[in-house]
A protein has these predicted regions:
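Predominantly flavin-linked oxidoreductase catalytic cores and closely associated redox partners
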Residues: 150-235
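Active-site substrate-recognition segment that forms the wall
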Residues: 23-28, 84-88, 194, 199, ...
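Glycine-rich FAD pyrophosphate-binding loop
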Residues: 27-48
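Dinucleotide-binding Rossmann-like beta1-alpha1 core, especially the glycine-rich loop
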Residues: 52-129, 254
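Flavin (FAD/FMN) cofactor-binding and adjacent substrate-gating region
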Residues: 78, 98-167, 171-172, 178-184, ...
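Beta1/beta-strand and adjacent pyrophosphate-binding region of the FAD-binding site
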Residues: 3-16
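N-terminal Rossmann-fold NAD(P) dinucleotide-binding loop
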Residues: 19-20
Length: 316
């Protein structure tokens, strides 16, 4: 059956990390799909940029996620085979902290509940195996061999390329003004045209508040800053020798990844400075107060990586 002009089975607003994946999978199933992205593809707005993203199976936030993560691993491997480029890098992950902290104990609980492979290592054992780690006495780490990272920018591009191959349609630099659910389906008005669809997926990240009124009181964007610091001892921070980590330091959760593409190890702090913002009011300029907590953590707990900051970037 030939579809009517400007009518689709599904319209997806926002072709970032999740929107590109939805476009790919729906087009692969034979649906007529239109993806609308207000920026370039890929772009450095929102939260999709940054070269790499952590992936692990012991999902502490809720053990019910674990079966979904198993499926995600399968899907990433399939996309990697179709694309012919390395996307999924499994060199291990470490969740570290003091033994009485929730992140540490909760991760062990999830691993045990779902029969995931793991080891518990003291701080000195972590340092002996992975010299880039120099955590304090009394800290322990849960090492998961099947954790690692995704080449997130490449993943987004791979999803978009394969969606095109599957017959999907994607428009970059096309801002959506409004949408409405009608008796006959969905109507989407962009700055360029009007489209209709049977279904709508909104994956607009921090811009979703502008499209879904109910989210305005329940989903508040925060300003985040990531840093890349060059190692004094580069071999200790390559992916094969430096597992990705989440670690609680003085009550503050930090995360980090090995040196990949950007000349430096990547480090961030969950919620950073806890600054609520909006896409329109985001202060995109990193400042000394943004850099300081990242450098302090790196210099104290990963001292081989205390060179001058190579890059700071903001996101939502």
């Amino acid at each position: 059956m030939t579809r009517s002009a400007n009518h689709y089975d599904v319209i997806i607003i926002g072709v970032g990390g999740m929107g590109s994946a939805a476009t790919y999978h729906l087009s692969k199933r034979g649906h007529d799909v239109l993806g609308l992205e207000q920026f370039d593809i890929p772009h450095e707005n929102g939260f999709n940029h940054g070269v790499t993203r952590i992936i692990r199976k012991a999902y502490l936030e809720d053990p019910e996620y674990v079966p979904l993560v198993h499926r995600a691993y399968e899907n990433w491997r399939t996309l990697q085979e179709e694309n012919g480029r390395k996307l999924l890098h499994l060199h291990g992950s470490v969740t570290a902290g003091r033994p009485d902290e929730r992140n540490f104990n909760g991760t062990i609980g999830v691993c045990e509940e779902h029969d995931l492979p793991f080891e518990v290592l003291r701080s000195d054992e972590l340092s002996a195996r992975f010299p880039g780690y120099q955590l304090p006495d009394g800290f322990k780490g849960v090492y998961q061999p099947d954790g690692g990272f995704l080449a997130s920018d490449r993943c987004l591009v791979a999803h978009v390329e394969k969606a095109f191959n599957n017959g999907g349609e994607i428009h970059a630099r096309e801002w959506v003004r409004d949408w409405d659910a009608t008796s006959s389906g969905i109507r989407v008005e962009s700055e360029d045209d009007v489209y209709t669809a049977d279904r709508l997926v909104i994956s607009a990240g921090p811009w979703a508040q502008e499209l879904v009124e109910k989210l305005q009181a329940n989903a508040t964007p925060e300003r985040q800053v990531l840093g890349w610091l060059p190692p004094d001892e580069p071999p200790n921070f390559i992916p094969e020798r430096f597992p990705v980590f989440t670690v609680t330091l003085d009550g503050e959760p930090f995360y980090g990844l090995p040196t990949v593409e950007v000349p430096g190890f990547k480090i961030g702090r969950h919620h950073h400075l806890e600054q609520e913002t909006t896409p329109a009011t985001l202060d995109e300029t990193p400042r000394p107060e943004d850099e300081r907590p990242l450098r302090d953590a790196a210099e104290e707990y990963f001292p081989g990586n205390a060179g001058p900051t190579m890059r700071l970037t903001t996101c939502l």
